C-alpha cells in the first residue's frame, strides 16, 4: 500500500506492508530519488538494566549511489562518522517517546537504498524511522517529525535541498512531536562576501525566531503522519512495564535518619560525576537493624535514595535559588587558562572550569593530511581541512576503564565543538588543521570546555581565526509553575535536570547550539530567557579568554613553514616529472610537502625547516625557468606542441578511456597517445580507471585539451 504525504516542501511516498513484514514495524519511504527502508524489531523478554535498551543504526549502502565500496574488502564495513552521527540524531529524537518502565531490547535500523544528491538524508532517515516506530506495536502517542531550516536571502527555508544549503547562513535541525520539541542542533555557516568572510552568527532573538519557524513545520509534519498512519498502526502489544519503585516506609526512614548524609553526598558529588558517596549510604542503610528486619532489597533502597537526592537538589534550586556547590544560578565555576604548555606541539591550551579540564592541542599540516571521505550525495570525495577530535578516557571521571576507539558520544561532542569553531577558521586558510581535545577531568560541560580551549589552541598555533569562540552548558529545571535556568551545569545537574543545552558563539551571536529536552514542551519566552542567560555567561568567559589570548607566546620555531606562489599552469607537468619522479625527488630531498593546483598554477610548499622550504621553492622556479628557456630556444619544441593537437578540433567527439583519476579531474585517453583533461566540475558520476566515456573537445590551449561530457 502506498501513501503520499505532502508536507514541509517534500512529497513523501510511504509503502507499508510491502517489505520487512516480519519486523514489528517497517516502511519504505521515498522522496524524489531517495529511498530509505526503516525497520523496528523488539524482543519479547525484558532486561534488568535501569535504562532504555534501544539501539539505532543508520546505514548507507554504497549501491545507493551506484558505487562499489573501495578498499580491499568490497562490502560495507564500519559505519562512517556521518552514519554514526545520524544514528545519534535519530536515537536522541525517538528515545523520549518510549513509555516509562519500558525494558524490552529494541532495534531501529535505517538503510539508505537510493540517494538523491539533493535530498537531506538525515531528515528522511529520522522521519522514516519515526513512521516505522509509530506503525509498530510499541505504544507511541504520536509520530516524531524532523525538519531542517536554512536562512537564505534573509528568509527562513524549510527543508532546503543540499544545493540550497550551500547558500544558507544557518543549518538548524529540529525534531519534535506535535507542539513539543525534543531535540535541536544548530550551526552557523560561514561564507565569503567579496574578500571578507562572514561568520554569520545568529542573535538570540533570531535563533528563537528560527526555532519557532521550525516548530510550526514539526506540528504540520507530525499531524500529517498521525492522520495518515493512525488507522494502520498495529494494536499496542500487551507489554509489562517496570513499576516505579515506591516504598513509603523506606522513604520515611531515609528522610528521618539520613537526610544529612544525603546532603553531604550531594556536596561531594558536586565535585565529581561518580556516585560512590550514595553507594556508601545505601550500604549503611542495608546494615541497619530496620533494613535487616524488614528484608529490604538493596536495589529498592538505592532507587529511593536516588529519588531523594534528586528531590533535595531540585528543591534547593527552585525554592532557595541555591545549587549543590553553593553557586548562584547564573554563576560560572572558577576558570584557569594556560596556553602553549606543550613545547613540541604547534599550539596547546589547558582550559579548566571547576572540575572539568580539557587539554586541547592543534597541529598544522599540508593538503595530504586532510581527512578524505566519501558521501552518497557528492560525486567527488569530500576533503576535510579542519578536523576536531574529542577523547574521553575513563580516568577523567576516576574510572579504571579500557581505552577504546571513540564511540558515539565522543564523535558527537567532537562534532559539536567543530561546528562551533568552524565559522571562525578562515575559509582560505592555507594549512590543514587537526585539533584534539583530551578530557583530563570531567564534571559536566566538557564539550564546551573543548570549544573554549580549542579556540585558544588555534590562536596558540598561529591560526588567524576571525574571533574567539566560547561555549557554556545550560540547564533547566521545572517544578509546577516555577522554573530555574542554570549556567555552567555540572554532572549532577545534568542528570537530575529537565533539559540541557549547550550554546557556543562569539560576542555577536551563536555559532552552534545543541539541545535535548526531557520534559516535552518549552515556551519560546523561557527559551529566549535561557539563551540570553547563556549569552551573559559566554561573554564572561570571553573576557577571560581575551586576557589569555593576549598572553599567548607563539613558538614560531616549531610551526611548519609555508610558501605559496604561482607558476604557469602549463608548467605543472614539468614540476611533476615523468611518473611523478621530479616532485618525489624534491619532497624526499627537502623533507617537505608540495601541493599543486593544476588549474590556477598555485604551488604550496610546507615543511618544518624554513631553509628547506625556500630551497624547494628555488628548485621549482628553476625547473619552470629551464622549461621556458627550452621552449624559446627550440623550434622543435614549439612545432612538436602544435603537432600533437593539430589532429583535434573543438567540438570533435571521441569514445575515450579513463586513464588516470586525480583530485582535480580525470585524464582521458583519446587517440595517437594523446590525453585530454575532464575537469572535476564536469564529472557527474563516480568514475573508475578503464571506464569508457563519450567526450567532446571543449578547448585546445597551449597544447592542452580540455574535455566535456557529451549530452
Swiss-Prot record:
It comes from Campylobacter hominis (strain ATCC BAA-381 / DSM 21671 / CCUG 45161 / LMG 19568 / NCTC 13146 / CH001A). Belongs to the polyribonucleotide nucleotidyltransferase family. PANTHER family: POLYRIBONUCLEOTIDE NUCLEOTIDYLTRANSFERASE, POLYRIBONUCLEOTIDE NUCLEOTIDYLTRANSFERASE 1, MITOCHONDRIAL. Involved in mRNA degradation. Catalyzes the phosphorolysis of single-stranded polyribonucleotides processively in the 3'- to 5'-direction. Its cofactor is Mg(2+). InterPro entries: ExoRNase_PH_dom1 (IPR001247), ExoRNase_PH_dom2 (IPR015847), ExoRNase_PH_dom2_sf (IPR036345), KH_dom (IPR004087), KH_dom_type_1 (IPR004088), KH_dom_type_1_sf (IPR036612), NA-bd_OB-fold (IPR012340), PNPase (IPR012162). SMART domains: KH, S1. Mg(2+) binds at residues 494, 500. This is Polyribonucleotide nucleotidyltransferase.
